[in-house]
A protein has these predicted regions:
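Fungal secretory targeting signals
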Residues: 1-24, 131
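All-alpha RGS (Regulator of G-protein Signaling) helical domain and cognate RGS-like helical scaffolds
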Residues: 21-463
């Protein structure tokens, strides 16, 4: 039978395929592609614990001819204020829709290799960081049982997320190893200051904090702009990891408006103590290891009242929380009260802050000259005198508070009341508390100018 509809179909002829029709969803099958193996081999590290091997044959940071005791401060460059910044175009366009200026925009093909010692040593310390994260995430899953994670509020989906973060680190380690070439640092063995899931998660969120900040500090100083682009795309993932660990810990996920960037020596100071040993002929680093700093009343996110603490860390440097002295009913995991309970969640907020302006913070520090890092082959060192100030380094700010009652490698100070902009307390989140002998004016782009006056570096759990 010829119907009106079928007549239309006949008239359209070859265009009939354009007429929409209802279909059942199906799965599109494609032949599997061959997996691409990482160029850098990844091994399961069987040894975890402090180094107990022979004395190192090489000690101290890598060094060559030193031209001056520090980089002298200088005024802004001659062109720092020359651009009018008026919204108008002030140069010819090199191509349509392309403003004049920029770096790496002249059409030269990127090669993604380091160009200077600064580039190499910066990428190398970042690779040391990727290796420890790869091991740490796997280690936690292998060490603690499903029921251990469940007791901390972390179920199978959370554990798989942790597994996926470890897989991300395979990609990061491969990328940076390929950039550096055959001399790239290899995976080491490690020693973690934790004994349960809550301590483990706290250590992870602190480790990823200084890993993230350590890259932000040098990223825009690299000579190899193309390498910086790849590293940016890697560290952006790590920023997400750090926030996830805060959520796992029941902390507010992102309590700051800006993330801080720190010098490489700060990152290496905080990382090296957790590396037990590295393979023979491992590439060594130039960066400084500052003496250890202990925060005696470091806020403890595992407590219902996290600021009411004394000596509840598993050690210096990251000053990771300890649950050892938390009694029955004192853990925030045991509370059902909103604002106190710290079970994992997308977001949480505490009725009692972990820290606050005016809080006394008690400190102790080690003498320099201590063996630290892989095979105990690095030595802590400082060019600063006796500490006189605490530098609170967070977001865009470096704010100093005077140390009080300085004696016998100990002192106390008071948390300052300072904001980046109105409504944003600068002292918040997982931040840096740095001991110095002077108040040096520095800003985010030249923070390393503070290093000659730094005695020691620690992480402070402000929020």
């Amino acid at each position: 039978m010829f119907t009106k509809f079928s007549g239309v179909i006949a008239l359209l002829g070859g265009l009939t395929s354009a007429i929409p029709f209802v279909s059942t969803p199906t799965t599109t099958l494609s032949p599997p592609s061959a997996p691409v193996s990482p160029d850098e081999p990844v091994t399961d590290v069987a040894s975890h614990g402090p180094y107990n091997g022979p004395s190192p044959t090489t000690t101290g940071a890598l060094s060559t001819n030193v031209l001056a005791p520090s980089v002298p401060a200088a005024p802004p460059g001659p062109d720092a204020y020359s651009y009018p910044s008026d919204g108008q175009l002030h140069g010819a366009e090199p191509a349509p829709y392309t403003p004049s200026g920029g770096l790496g925009t002249n059409g030269s093909a990127p090669v993604y290799r380091v160009l200077t010692d600064f580039d190499y040593q910066s990428i190398a310390v970042a690779l040391y960081q990727e290796w420890i994260e790869l091991d740490l995430f796997h280690w936690g899953l292998a060490t603690f049982s499903d029921s251990d994670f469940q007791a901390a509020g972390l179920g199978p989906y959370d554990r798989y997320l942790l597994q996926f973060m470890a897989e991300q680190e395979v990609g990061h380690a491969t990328l940076l190893s390929n950039i550096l070439g055959p001399s790239a640092p290899s995976q080491c063995t490690y020693n973690y200051p934790v004994s349960n899931v809550h301590e483990y998660i706290d250590f992870c969120q602190k480790l990823t904090r200084f890993g993230e900040s350590g890259v932000y500090g040098f990223l825009n100083h690299l000579n190899a702009r193309d390498v910086g682009q790849l590293l940016l795309q890697s560290i952006s993932t790590e920023a997400r990891q750090q926030m996830i660990f805060r959520q796992f810990e029941g902390l507010f996920p992102m309590p700051v408006w800006f993330e801080v960037g720190t010098p490489q020596s700060w990152a290496w100071t905080l990382l090296a103590p957790y590396i037990s040993s590295c393979p023979e002929n491992q590439t060594r680093l130039i960066w400084q290891n500052f003496p250890a700093v202990y925060i005696l009343n470091q806020p403890n996110p595992a407590r219902a009242n996290g600021s009411d603490v004394w000596n509840e860390t598993t050690g210096p440097w990251t000053n990771t929380l300890s649950t050892q002295d938390i009694g029955q009913g004192e853990s925030c995991l045991d509370s059902d009260t909103p604002g106190v309970n710290c079970m994992p969640g997308i977001t949480k907020n505490r009725s009692q802050p972990l820290s606050y302006p005016g809080r006394q913070v008690f400190l102790r520090w080690d003498d320099p000259g201590q063996a630290v890092g892989p095979n105990n082959s690095y030595v802590t060192n400082t060019t600063a005198g006796i500490p006189a100030f605490a530098a609170w380094v967070s977001q865009l700010n470096v704010t100093y508070s005077a140390l009080q009652d300085v004696a016998n490698n100990s002192a106390w100070t008071v948390q300052p009341n300072v904001s980046t902009f109105a409504g944003d307390p600068a002292v918040n989140g997982t931040m840096y508390l740095v001991l110095t002998d002077e108040e040096v004016y520095v800003t985010p782009f030249n923070l390393s100018m503070l290093n000659p006056r730094v005695y020691g570096v620690a992480l402070y759990q402000a929020g």
